[in-house]
């Protein structure tokens, strides 16, 4: 029989207060006309350089890679698309650099990143008869690094790329400890790659770090570097202005005082969504999605870290009804959050109805209701004498409660590109890439956070459920889930192969969302414990400008 909620203490988590408060209210700097003109002039020079460089040359590969890693490729999407298509089409023909590990690996990675299937057999020439990579390659640090990055584009059953990852990781770890400070640029680049491979790197974080690495590379193109710095700083001002507007909205709600038990993480939510899309054209969508994510965080903490079961019964019911008249049925302290939730989606409807895109909000509401039902399911298990669900049952619910299915759908609501009903239906039906992304988020979050959650009385995580059902140790369970995460990344990679089921920009949102999970939950839950690593990352991309 279920225990009475009146007999239970509220499961307070004692989250630390906001790191930032209302710091970004004052960031209202406008981008000057002089800045815009200067960036546009550089942009046209770089565009000319990109178009005039021969597609089938190493220089073109290096240039495109630098543009992407410096964070300026979004200015040249069409030109890069055409170039990579030409490079892919020509890849079946003999090339002068086909025995150069650096070039072959770079071409492979760029082509696969763009969604073209290039066979991993291109690496066979670098292996012995036993399938192992030749030891002579260990002297080629740039080649090893290029192969290492390429191996992260692998899909399931690509044994040669599994071998490549093992081989390069072993030797790069040895090399980085032995490189002298005279090779500091290369040492930093290798160290960064081992920590966060390009495929798993958030675009803005990657750009911020690579600008410094590229500047210290003697072979850098000074015009491209200057353009990347100017563009980074201009975008930073743009993002600061957005965050200032959002901070004003958050301050007016006064939720830091109304919900002291919840994580006050507006800036961290903005960083999260900035990871999904940073380009200026996504400004409206970014602001909408940040509001939704911030409210979701409050609702999540209400379920996990404050409300009683009886209070949550009516709260869940009100959200499923999605009706302002339901507000009187819930606890007074819950009403501001409920009203804010209705208001956010109502604002979306007002904006999108003018564009004939009202149906998008229907899909977004459905995903939010589904997420809250998953939260409530966990509450029911916990209320049922701390019932530990079967692992398979918990997996299905936990993938939804991770929130990534909701975000994958809702992040598309405010964007201006055309999105068909079929695309939204595809997302909502737990497509392979969305499910893989949600699994990565849930598994990584549970690995770093399950022990803290259990201390305050949280429903059994995937970790506890697996250990109970399969008699596994904690370490064995961690290994199992890290393997699941690796395989999920392979599934994501495969979904990018053309022809894709949905537009590439939709897949890119899910990829970036997965990168956020990898960044936030790599070693600990930096969203919950936001004072260290995450604070530094936010500082580097939203406060500190790049020195020109």
Curated annotation (Swiss-Prot):
Look up keyword Transmembrane and say if it applies.
no
| SUPFAM superfamilies tied to this protein | Terpenoid cyclases/Protein prenyltransferases, Terpenoid synthases
Q: In which tissues is it expressed?
A: Mostly expressed in stem and trichomes, to a lower extent in roots, leaves and flowers and, at low levels, in fruits.
Could you tell me what reaction this enzyme catalyses? Answer: (2E,6E)-farnesyl diphosphate = germacrene C + diphosphate; (2E)-geranyl diphosphate = terpinolene + diphosphate; (2E)-geranyl diphosphate = limonene + diphosphate; (2E)-geranyl diphosphate = beta-myrcene + diphosphate
**Which biological process terms from the Gene Ontology are attached to this UniProt entry?**
diterpenoid biosynthetic process; terpenoid biosynthetic process
Entry binding sites for Mg(2+) 2: 300, 304
Main location (coarse class): cytoplasm
- Name the family the entry cites: Belongs to the terpene synthase family. Tpsa subfamily.
Protein's UniProt name: Sesquiterpene synthase 9
């Amino acid at each position: 029989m279920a225990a009475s909620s009146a007999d239970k203490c509220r499961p307070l988590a004692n989250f630390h207060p906001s790191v930032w408060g209302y710091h970004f209210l004052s960031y209202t700097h406008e981008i000057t006309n002089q800045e815009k003109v200067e960036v546009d002039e550089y942009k046209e020079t770089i565009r000319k350089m990109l178009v005039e460089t021969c597609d089938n040359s190493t220089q073109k590969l290096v240039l495109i890679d630098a543009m992407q890693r410096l964070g300026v490729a979004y200015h040249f999407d069409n030109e890069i698309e055409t170039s990579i298509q030409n490079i892919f089409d020509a890849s079946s023909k003999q090339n002068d650099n086909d025995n150069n590990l650096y070039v072959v690996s770079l071409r492979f990675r760029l082509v696969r990143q763009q969604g073209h299937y290039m066979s991993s057999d291109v690496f066979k020439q670098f292996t012995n008869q036993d399938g192992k990579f030749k030891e002579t390659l260990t002297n080629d640090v740039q080649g090893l690094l290029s192969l290492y990055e390429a191996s992260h584009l692998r899909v399931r059953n690509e044994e040669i790329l599994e071998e490549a990852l093992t081989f390069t990781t072993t030797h790069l770890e040895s090399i980085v400890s032995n490189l002298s400070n005279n090779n500091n640029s290369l040492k930093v680049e290798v160290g960064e790659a081992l920590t966060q491979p390009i495929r798993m790197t958030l675009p803005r974080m990657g750009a911020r770090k690579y600008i410094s690495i590229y500047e210290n590379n003697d072979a850098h193109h000074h015009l491209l570097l200057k353009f990347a710095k100017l563009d980074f700083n201009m975008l930073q001002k743009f993002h600061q202005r957005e965050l200032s507007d959002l901070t004003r909205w958050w301050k007016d709600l006064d939720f830091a005082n109304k919900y002291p038990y919840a994580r006050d993480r507006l800036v961290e939510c903005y960083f999260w969504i900035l990871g999904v899309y940073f380009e200026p054209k996504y400004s409206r969508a970014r602001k909408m999605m940040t509001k939704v994510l911030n409210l979701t965080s409050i609702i999540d903490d209400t379920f996990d870290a404050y409300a009683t079961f009886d209070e949550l019964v009516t709260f869940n019911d009100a959200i499923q009804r999605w009706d302002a008249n339901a507000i009187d049925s819930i606890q007074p302290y819950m009403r501001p959050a409920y009203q804010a939730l209705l208001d956010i989606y109502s604002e979306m409807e007002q904006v999108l109805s003018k564009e004939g895109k009202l149906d998008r909000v229907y899909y977004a509401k459905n995903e939010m209701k589904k997420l809250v039902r998953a939260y409530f399911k966990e509450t029911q298990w916990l209320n049922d004498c701390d019932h530990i669900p079967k692992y398979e049952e918990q997996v299905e619910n936990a993938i939804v409660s991770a929130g990534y299915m909701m975000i994958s759908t809702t992040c598309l609501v405010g964007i201006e590109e055309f999105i068909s009903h079929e695309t939204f239906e595809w997302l909502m039906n737990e497509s392979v890439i969305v499910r893989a992304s949600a699994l990565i988020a849930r598994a990584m979050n549970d690995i770093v956070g399950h022990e803290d959650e259990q201390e305050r009385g949280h429903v059994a995580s995937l970790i506890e459920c697996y250990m109970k059902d399969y008699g596994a140790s904690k370490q064995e369970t961690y290994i199992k889930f890290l393997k699941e995460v690796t395989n999920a990344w392979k599934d994501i990679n495969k979904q990018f192969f053309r022809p894709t089921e949905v537009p590439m920009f939709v897949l890119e949102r899910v990829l970036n969302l997965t990168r956020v999970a990898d960044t936030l939950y790599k070693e600990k839950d930096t969203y919950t414990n936001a004072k260290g690593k995450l604070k530094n990352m936010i500082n580097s991309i939203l406060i500190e400008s790049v020195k020109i």
